[in-house]
Regions:
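Generic serine detector
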Residues: 16, 54, 64, 108, ...
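Bacterial N-terminal signal peptides
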Residues: 10-20
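Short S/T/G/P-rich N-terminal loop/turn motif that feeds into the first structured element of a domain
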Residues: 5, 18-90, 97-101, 131-135
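Surface-exposed, polar helix/loop patches in the mature regions of secreted/periplasmic/lumenal proteins
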Residues: 91-135
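Bacterial N-terminal signal peptides that target proteins for export
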Residues: 1-11
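Intrinsically disordered, low-complexity sequence elements enriched in Ser/Thr/Gly/Pro
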Residues: 3-4, 73, 116, 123
Length: 135
Protein backbone atom coordinates (compact mmCIF):
# COMPACT_ATOMS: atom_id res chain seq x y z
CA UNK A 1 0.00 0.00 0.00
CA UNK A 2 2.86 2.39 0.81
CA UNK A 3 4.30 1.88 -2.68
CA UNK A 4 0.98 2.76 -4.32
CA UNK A 5 0.70 5.86 -2.14
CA UNK A 6 4.22 7.00 -3.10
CA UNK A 7 3.52 6.32 -6.77
CA UNK A 8 0.30 8.33 -6.62
CA UNK A 9 2.11 11.24 -4.96
CA UNK A 10 4.86 11.10 -7.59
CA UNK A 11 2.32 11.14 -10.42
CA UNK A 12 0.44 14.07 -8.84
CA UNK A 13 3.70 15.97 -8.38
CA UNK A 14 4.61 15.36 -12.03
CA UNK A 15 1.22 16.53 -13.22
CA UNK A 16 1.44 19.65 -11.03
CA UNK A 17 4.89 20.51 -12.36
CA UNK A 18 3.69 19.94 -15.93
CA UNK A 19 0.67 22.20 -15.42
CA UNK A 20 2.81 24.92 -13.86
CA UNK A 21 5.23 24.77 -16.79
CA UNK A 22 2.37 24.92 -19.32
CA UNK A 23 0.89 27.94 -17.54
CA UNK A 24 4.28 29.68 -17.51
CA UNK A 25 4.74 29.06 -21.24
CA UNK A 26 1.21 30.31 -21.97
CA UNK A 27 1.82 33.44 -19.87
CA UNK A 28 5.03 34.16 -21.79
CA UNK A 29 3.25 33.73 -25.12
CA UNK A 30 0.39 35.97 -24.00
CA UNK A 31 2.87 38.74 -23.22
CA UNK A 32 4.33 38.85 -26.74
CA UNK A 33 3.13 42.18 -28.12
CA UNK A 34 1.39 42.46 -31.46
CA UNK A 35 3.11 44.21 -34.34
CA UNK A 36 1.95 46.57 -37.05
CA UNK A 37 3.45 47.19 -40.45
CA UNK A 38 2.83 50.82 -41.33
CA UNK A 39 3.37 51.98 -44.89
CA UNK A 40 3.27 55.51 -46.21
CA UNK A 41 2.96 55.16 -49.97
CA UNK A 42 3.24 58.01 -52.45
CA UNK A 43 2.94 57.89 -56.22
CA UNK A 44 6.30 58.75 -57.72
CA UNK A 45 6.03 60.95 -60.83
CA UNK A 46 9.59 59.98 -61.83
CA UNK A 47 8.55 56.32 -62.12
CA UNK A 48 6.31 54.81 -64.76
CA UNK A 49 3.31 52.99 -63.35
CA UNK A 50 2.21 49.80 -65.08
CA UNK A 51 -1.57 49.47 -64.50
CA UNK A 52 -1.55 45.69 -65.08
CA UNK A 53 1.31 45.22 -62.60
CA UNK A 54 -0.45 47.48 -60.08
CA UNK A 55 -3.59 45.32 -60.35
CA UNK A 56 -1.47 42.21 -59.80
CA UNK A 57 0.07 43.76 -56.68
CA UNK A 58 -3.39 44.73 -55.37
CA UNK A 59 -4.56 41.12 -55.86
CA UNK A 60 -1.46 39.33 -54.57
CA UNK A 61 -0.55 41.47 -51.54
CA UNK A 62 -3.60 40.41 -49.48
CA UNK A 63 -2.98 36.75 -50.39
CA UNK A 64 0.61 37.03 -49.13
CA UNK A 65 -0.72 37.93 -45.66
CA UNK A 66 -2.79 34.76 -45.16
CA UNK A 67 0.10 32.49 -44.13
CA UNK A 68 1.00 34.98 -41.38
CA UNK A 69 -2.54 35.39 -39.96
CA UNK A 70 -2.29 39.11 -40.68
CA UNK A 71 -4.99 41.52 -41.71
CA UNK A 72 -5.36 45.01 -43.07
CA UNK A 73 -6.43 47.53 -40.46
CA UNK A 74 -6.07 50.56 -42.73
CA UNK A 75 -5.79 50.41 -46.51
CA UNK A 76 -5.78 53.86 -48.04
CA UNK A 77 -8.67 55.32 -46.08
CA UNK A 78 -9.47 59.02 -45.90
CA UNK A 79 -6.80 60.94 -43.93
CA UNK A 80 -7.47 63.94 -41.70
CA UNK A 81 -4.25 65.62 -40.61
CA UNK A 82 -4.46 66.82 -37.02
CA UNK A 83 -0.91 68.09 -36.70
CA UNK A 84 2.16 68.41 -38.89
CA UNK A 85 2.51 67.89 -42.61
CA UNK A 86 -0.10 65.74 -44.34
CA UNK A 87 1.11 62.58 -46.07
CA UNK A 88 1.44 63.02 -49.82
CA UNK A 89 0.02 59.60 -50.55
CA UNK A 90 -1.92 57.01 -48.61
CA UNK A 91 -1.41 54.95 -45.45
CA UNK A 92 -1.59 51.19 -44.99
CA UNK A 93 -1.56 49.47 -41.59
CA UNK A 94 -1.36 45.68 -41.31
CA UNK A 95 -1.77 43.87 -37.98
CA UNK A 96 0.38 40.86 -37.06
CA UNK A 97 0.58 38.58 -34.03
CA UNK A 98 4.18 39.70 -33.35
CA UNK A 99 7.24 41.34 -34.91
CA UNK A 100 8.67 38.02 -36.07
CA UNK A 101 5.55 37.30 -38.15
CA UNK A 102 5.60 40.81 -39.59
CA UNK A 103 9.23 40.47 -40.63
CA UNK A 104 8.56 36.93 -41.87
CA UNK A 105 5.83 38.25 -44.17
CA UNK A 106 7.94 41.16 -45.48
CA UNK A 107 10.79 38.81 -46.42
CA UNK A 108 8.58 35.89 -47.52
CA UNK A 109 8.90 34.51 -51.06
CA UNK A 110 5.26 35.46 -51.75
CA UNK A 111 5.82 39.12 -50.88
CA UNK A 112 9.35 39.27 -52.32
CA UNK A 113 7.82 38.26 -55.67
CA UNK A 114 5.53 41.30 -55.80
CA UNK A 115 7.46 43.88 -53.77
CA UNK A 116 9.29 45.21 -56.88
CA UNK A 117 5.94 46.21 -58.40
CA UNK A 118 5.36 48.66 -55.53
CA UNK A 119 8.99 49.75 -55.43
CA UNK A 120 9.07 50.47 -59.17
CA UNK A 121 6.03 52.74 -59.16
CA UNK A 122 5.94 54.44 -55.74
CA UNK A 123 7.98 56.04 -53.01
CA UNK A 124 7.34 54.14 -49.80
CA UNK A 125 8.31 54.22 -46.19
CA UNK A 126 7.63 50.85 -44.54
CA UNK A 127 7.94 50.40 -40.78
CA UNK A 128 7.24 47.59 -38.34
CA UNK A 129 6.11 48.85 -34.94
CA UNK A 130 5.74 46.76 -31.82
CA UNK A 131 2.36 47.26 -30.19
CA UNK A 132 1.41 46.83 -26.55
CA UNK A 133 -0.01 43.73 -24.91
CA UNK A 134 -3.60 43.72 -23.68
CA UNK A 135 -3.83 45.29 -20.26
Amino acid sequence: MKTNHKLTLAVLAGVSIGLAAAQAIHAQQAEVPPAYVIAEVEKDPTKIEDPAASRRYAEEAPKSLAAFQARYLVRGGKIQTLEGEAPKGYIVVIGFENVEKARGWYYSPAYEAIKPIRQNSTKSRILVVEGITAQ
